[in-house]
Swiss-Prot record:
Pathway note: Lipid metabolism; fatty acid beta-oxidation
Family: In the N-terminal section; belongs to the enoyl-CoA hydratase/isomerase family.
Subunit structure: Heterotetramer of two alpha chains (FadJ) and two beta chains (FadI).
Name of the featured protein: Fatty acid oxidation complex subunit alpha
Gene of this entry: fadJ
Length: 715
């Protein structure tokens, strides 16, 4: 056996070379620039061994093939030329793999992403396991980049241009059966026989060429291709609002390769990669990636977590059902649900059943796996089965006496070490724990709806919460697949506190006569996934406005909303999407395609509905209030760092990730510019825009959130 640092070559007795990939000291395999020499040394041995029948690339890691290229390599590039050179080096290495004179098979188990999939594409055939951990994709667009090692050229030729565009423009990841159907892999097998199946495929002298589906063959022709790219460009521009330059370059590069040939395509790919790597959008998106990775590693406190073997949930409603699903089906923990009636329990069970059944229908999991996961969830109308639960999450109504009663009942019916975690969105955790016998084991755990989709949770200790309770709760959130940030027990916590003035200002502009669709379109153009008015409809107008009095009582008039407007809307039985009417009207089952602004909303609030502000002015008014409040949260140590503030806003409310989060965005604008803009808006619209003390101080000292050592205040 010849051994290198991350690649091991073993020639079997049947003359098939097996190259095992195992980056030392790392949980996952990533491709690094220094590995090129190691791979080339192995390729040289393979070329020189004339007796070889084939080659298999396989990972020695337990649950991943190659998770991608090491993104740090891009950060070391000083200019576009250096990044372009990096791409060309990757392209050359993949070309050398593809040029091997014997069949080359990629045997894939676990994540095969980015540079990992580009390497698999350079192999002659691909075979993967049917494991749920196996996913294949090119997610570079999510970092403001495009695949730089040949992915934009090989993938369209393998699966067809339409499928390739969809994969590369969205960064979507395909599971094993999806990859097989798309033609991305040639076979799907159990993990136990992956190597032998790959070896047998490598021994075949002739590997049959795959024929593209008729639709893809039509789209590959000049006329079909022209129509496809015209439609894709239009659809992509509508979706990105011009905020993500990588998508435009991806389309251009793929089209170049198909129209002018692979050589021109590879050249265009490398140049585009180099240029995109230097864009502020890519730098911001990579910063979000690194920050989220750090947050996921953060234990929350210095204390070791307590036991976490099973969880209880109080309330089987929308939130309770979602929390049960992420706990059992993502976290793998047994869950016991308590509700006052069996209907609530049945609702929670159906919630998980529906999500799992969808996965079965899409062939993401087998029916047996669905049943296995569902078996982790049980329910009761009393506290039977709760005595041994390590942590209990309450998801009942936002009523302080009720939540205090839940604390007392859990302390009476559960173990002495059981943690009580409240999913409150507005009530102080200290008040919920006020009468607790063990207040050190009471904490907030604020999920966002829909629970199965929203990645963020806020972990909220109160003054007496123990360090171990924090660590255990953070550990649970991570097991649930969430990204947790620890925030202070102050009104609104962090996410709702910065969101409220943003939505309030949108409502205020409505009362000034601005049109609903104009306000929403302005913020979508700025980079939010939906506008503030639509967001209020989605959350529920009754639910979304409930926190406003709490915030106004805590922080004063800057949180006041036009109360008469909110009351008029609620009195007209407008709750948003959930009852089919809010600021928008919704068609049958609330389908988005049927959504349209209800003209009656203007009469209801007593305005004509004629927009006078530009889109930039609308966005500025909403966003500046959000940024100012985020800076206050930093100053008051509501968040522990600018890192947590950026991740909380991006993952919790969809703050434009290409701006890096509110704190990176404020740094980009500069504190002096922030203060000047807020002062200008305060002169126009009132003292709610007055710049906070934190920003004024930073402007005077010319400081930044991310560069002055203030990014980790809590530790």
């Amino acid at each position: 056996m010849t051994t290198t640092s991350a690649f091991m070559l073993n020639v079997r007795l049947d003359n098939v070379a097996v190259v095992a990939i195992d980056v030392p000291g790392e949980k996952v395999n990533t491709l690094k620039a220094e590995f090129a020499a190691q791979v080339r040394a192995i390729l040289k041995q393979i070329r020189e061994n004339k007796a070889l029948q084939g080659v298999v690339f396989i990972s020695a890691k337990a649950d991943n093939f190659i998770a991608g290229a090491d993104i740090n390599m891009i950060g070391h590039c000083q200019n576009a030329q250096e990044a372009e050179t990096l791409a060309r080096q990757g392209q050359q290495l993949m070309a050398e793999i593809q040029a091997l004179p014997v069949p080359v098979i990629a045997a894939i188990h676990g994540a095969c992403l980015g540079g990992g999939l580009e390497m698999a594409l350079a192999c002659h055939r691909r075979i993967c396991t049917d494991d749920v951990k196996t996913v294949l994709g090119l997610p570079e667009v999510q970092l403001g980049l495009l695949p730089g090692s040949g992915g934009t050229q090989r993938l369209p030729r393998l699966v067809g241009v339409s499928t390739a565009l969809d994969m590369i423009l969205t960064g979507k990841q395909l599971r094993a059966r999806q990859a097989l159907k798309a033609g991305l892999v040639d076979d799907v097998v159990p993990q136990t026989i992956l190597l032998e199946a790959a070896v047998e495929l490598a021994k075949k002298e002739r590997l049959a060429q795959r024929t593209l589906p008729v639709r893809e063959r039509i789209l590959a022709g000049p006329l079909g291709r022209a129509l496809l790219f015209r439609l894709v460009r239009k659809k992509t521009a509508q979706k990105t609002q011009g905020n993500y330059p990588a998508t435009e370059r991806i389309i251009d590069v793929i089209e170049t390769g198909l129209a002018q040939g692979s050589s021109s395509g590879y050249d265009a790919e490398a140049r585009a990669f180099g240029e995109l790597a230097m864009t502020p959008q890519s730098q911001a998106l990579r910063a979000v990636f690194f920050a989220s990775t750090e947050v996921k590693k953060d234990p929350g406190s210095d204390a070791p977590p307590g036991p976490l073997n099973s969880v209880g949930i109080l309330g089987g409603g929308l939130m309770g059902g979602g929390i049960a699903w992420v706990t059992a089906c993502k976290g793998g923990l047994p869950v016991r649900i308590k509700d006052i009636n069996t209907q609530g329990i049945n609702h929670a069970l159906k919630y998980s059943w529906d999500l799992l059944e969808t996965k079965v229908r899409r062939r993401h999991i087998k029916a047996s796996e669905r049943d296995k996961q569902l078996a982790l969830i049980s329910g009761s109308t009393d506290y039977r089965g709760f005595s041994h639960r390590d942590l209990v999450i309450e998801a009942v109504f936002e009523d302080l006496p009720l939540k205090q009663q839940m604390v007392a009942e859990v302390e009476q019916n559960c173990a002495a070490h059981t943690i009580f975690a409240s999913n409150t969105s507005s009530l102080p955790i200290g008040d919920i724990a006020a009468n607790a016998a063990r207040p050190e084991q009471v904490i907030g755990l604020h999920f966002f709806s829909p629970v199965e989709k929203m990645p963020l949770v806020e972990v909220i200790p109160h003054a007496s919460t123990s360090a171990q309770t924090i660590a255990t709760t953070v550990k649970l959130a991570k097991k649930q697949g969430k990204t947790p940030i620890v925030v202070s027990d102050k009104a609104g916590f962090y996410v709702n506190r910065i969101l409220a003035p943003y939505i309030n200002e949108a409502i205020r502009m409505l009362t000034e006569g601005e049109r609903v669709e104009h306000i929403d379109a302005a913020l979508v153009k700025f980079g939010f996934p939906v506008g503030p008015i639509q967001l209020l409809d989605e959350v529920g107008i009754d639910t979304g406005t409930k926190i406003i009095p709490v915030l106004e009582a805590a922080y004063g008039e800057r949180f006041s909303a036009p109360a008469n407007v909110v009351a008029s809307i609620l009195n007209d039985d407008r709750k948003g999407r959930k009852n089919g009417r809010g600021f928008y009207l919704y068609g049958e089952k609330g389908r988005k395609s049927k959504k349209q602004v209800d003209p009656a909303i203007y009469k209801l609030i007593g305005v004509q509905g004629q927009s006078r502000l530009s889109a930039q002015q609308v966005a500025e008014r909403c966003v500046m209030l959000m940024l100012n409040e985020a800076a206050r949260c930093f100053d008051e140590k509501v968040i522990r760092s600018a890192r947590d503030g950026d991740i909380g806003a991006v993952f919790g409310i969809g703050f434009p990730p290409f701006l890096g989060g509110p704190f990176r965005y404020m740094d980009a604008l500069g504190p002096g510019e922030m203060v000047a803009t807020l002062q200008r808006l305060a002169a126009l619209y009132g003292p709610r825009y007055a710049p906070c003390e934190q920003l004024v101080r930073m402007a005077e000292r010319r400081e930044h959130f991310w560069t002055n050592g203030e990014t980790d205040q809590g530790n």
